[in-house]
Amino acid sequence: MTISIETLRELRHEFHRFPELGFQEKQTKIKIASFLKAKGLEVVEGVGVVGILKSGKDTKTIGLRADMDALPIQETSKHPYSSTYPGVMHACGHDGHMTMLLGAAEELAHSLDFDGTVIFIFQPNEENGLGAKAMLDEDLLSKFPMSDIFALHNLPGIETGHLLTRKGLICSSESLFEIRLKGQGGHASMPHVGRDTISVGSEIIQSLQNIISKRLPPGSGSVLSVTEFISDGARNVLPGTSLIKGDVRSRNEEDRLEIKRLMNKIVEGISRAHEIDSHVSFETEFVETINSADQTETVIKVAEELGLNFNGNCEPMSFSEDFAHFSNVVPGCLFLLGNGQSGHGSDPLHSSSYDFNDNLLPIGVKVWSSLVRKLLPKSGMQA
């Protein structure tokens, strides 16, 4: 490996100190573009950053993707490289994802021991499910036609460097819902005069819990979570309006649409019974992420050849990934690398104490570089 572990660490810590939210990754993009240009790559900038590296005469092209955005979370860890921006931190490891892909770009630019073209894709705003679509809207795939596309994500609680993937469904979809209730507010001592939306909202919330347990098949893997319940009431004021928000995860479109149908039916029925108005919105930004068979087999072979511990038929993940918008168009594979089982790197994703495990950086670089050499072998080299 041509890039040192210390250089990888420094690069990752620099990203960690200066996190930027989705579609605000201005300085992050500047750093990435400068790094790639310094290594001799052609760089195209738009909503994201794309690096192009060619070697040999083969026209085959593959894409490797990393996400760039941070989260609106106040970091509680006290590392020397902790976030310098109040209320913003890299709590999902995108600092590490960027670093590993940049490390692979340097490694491959130095060796050029492959035949074809590699497109290094640095994507904004993964956390809100909008970044991949924004790059597709800029005609990423027509400008850079690819035969395969890949992405990785770190996974705390799993042995460092342990690789997990599977053919078919790898990540659930995510749908966000809002239920707006409008009744008649009033004095807390005279509930019969008004139409209280808190009691109606509570009844709706309880009924929603029956969708997964009673209406979908056991083992569906779907999750419905109510995450917010807001009203305009006060200590002695019954609310006239309430807002219920939540999150749905599904493993297939059929279940997702059935949850949406039942939610609308429950809200309409309970609201009508209590003579209040209601409105439901149900929006899906993250669709299910599906891994293609051939690309997944290639990732598994790379893990075998590198001597990594791996599981090539892991359980589908309940979280969501907007890499799905790429892999729905180009055959692809998302795989996971363990971030550590204890100590450094084991805290959950999206927690204020989370930190990417620096020991994973060289492993990720090796996986990316080996994947390129496997898919784009030089003449005379074993594929």
Question: Which sequence ranges carry the predicted segments?
Answer:
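Metal-dependent amide/peptide-bond hydrolase catalytic core
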Residues: A38, S202-A383
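Non-cysteine beta-strand/loop elements that form the S-adenosyl-L-methionine
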Residues: G63-R65, Q74, F177, L334-G340
